């Protein structure tokens, strides 16, 4: 087939408008506005396991990514589980504190996937603000526009401006899969818009001259949370090897997020045993086992990737910070856990 030359291709505005209109009622039987962001994340995660591959005969097919095969597939953590982990992790940080005291808390998932843990964290923080204002400062909060009641309901809603601020200031994530990063951003933006009217969002824009949807590029980033620039000391030729650079996706935490650490690290790190890690990323495995590796648990015979995520998470925490992971129970009883 021949590639289309973009400069010679012209598409009428009416065609684009028709495409968009076909996605919505009454031209489409699906009402995307009522789909829960968690469901969208689960749908997308079905496709994050696969990559397009060009075969030797020139045909294109989808194949499971090697790291997914070796870890028996990506695991989508159910919402009821993420909610429990978030409750246990964030409650000690938020309990008996004011919105001013928690305004600069930084919550991160360093293997965020499609963003389920970040969605639960965002929801927890939003609900914390609603309950605080209801119980301590309701009249002033209503007057300021921080909360308001839904028509015909006793339930309170946090203003879109406050939710937008929480997204920008409190929620952070990293994932090695660029598609997962985009899904996380998309899901979080949908969650922020939940229960907010178009009129409220437009009023915010007119009052502040800011975009209705915040740019989350500085919050949710693509990279390898476990491999930093120390890899270049292990393999000095890495900067001359573009394919290896693209594979490793070295991530400089200070450059990407500044010197500030996090108040909570949450997530469900991948479980990939050392034997499987060698198959899809020998370079990564050799780095973890080298003298340049910052990971103590990597020197054990029973290395599993989630060990490294525990170590990395602990190094990224502020004093008094909280780590909330789902890990196999055996970790508490083996030598690697003791380290």
Predicted feature residues:
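Short, hydrophobic/amphipathic alpha-helical patches that form generic packing surfaces
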Residues: 18, 42-49, 186-193
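Glycine-rich, acidic and aromatic/proline-enriched surface loops and short helix-turn segments
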Residues: 41, 45-53, 87, 91, ...
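Non-catalytic nucleic-acid substrate-recognition regions in nucleic-acid-modifying enzymes
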Residues: 1-42
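Residues that form generic nucleotide/phosphate-binding pockets
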Residues: 19-23, 46, 287-291
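Short, helix-capping/interhelical loops that line the mouth of catalytic, cofactor-
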Residues: 56
């Amino acid at each position: 087939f021949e590639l289309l030359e973009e400069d010679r291709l012209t598409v009428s505005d009416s065609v684009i408008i028709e495409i968009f209109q076909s996605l919505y009622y009454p031209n489409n039987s699906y009402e995307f506005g009522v789909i829960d962001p968690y469901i969208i994340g689960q749908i997308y995660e079905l496709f994050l396991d696969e990559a397009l591959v060009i075969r030797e005969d020139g045909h294109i097919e989808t194949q499971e990514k090697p790291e997914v095969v070796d870890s028996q597939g990506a695991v989508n953590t159910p919402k009821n589980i993420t909610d429990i982990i978030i409750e246990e992790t964030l409650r000690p940080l938020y309990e008996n504190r004011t919105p001013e005291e928690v305004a600069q808390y930084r919550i991160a998932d360093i293997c965020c996937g499609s963003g389920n843990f970040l969605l639960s964290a965002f929801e927890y923080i939003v609900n914390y603000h609603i309950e605080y204002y209801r119980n301590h400062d309701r009249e002033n909060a209503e007057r300021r526009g921080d909360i308001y009641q839904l028509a015909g309901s006793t339930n309170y809603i946090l203003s879109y401006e406050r939710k937008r601020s929480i997204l920008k200031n409190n929620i952070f994530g990293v994932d090695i899969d660029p598609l997962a990063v985009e899904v996380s951003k998309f899901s979080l933006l949908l969650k922020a818009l939940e229960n907010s009217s178009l009129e409220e969002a437009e009023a915010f824009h007119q009052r502040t001259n800011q975009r209705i949807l915040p740019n989350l590029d500085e919050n949710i980033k693509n990279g390898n949370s476990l491999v930093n620039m120390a890899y270049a000391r292990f393999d000095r030729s890495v900067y001359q090897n573009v394919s290896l650079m693209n594979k490793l996706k070295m991530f400089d935490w200070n450059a990407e997020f500044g010197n500030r650490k996090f108040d909570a690290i949450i997530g469900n790190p991948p479980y990939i045993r050392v034997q499987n890690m060698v198959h899809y990323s020998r370079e990564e495995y050799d780095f973890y086992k080298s003298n340049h590796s910052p990971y103590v648990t990597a020197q054990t015979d029973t290395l599993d990737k989630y060990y490294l995520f525990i170590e990395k998470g602990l190094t990224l925490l502020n004093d008094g910070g909280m780590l909330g992971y789902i890990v196999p129970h055996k970790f508490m009883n083996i030598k690697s856990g003791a380290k």
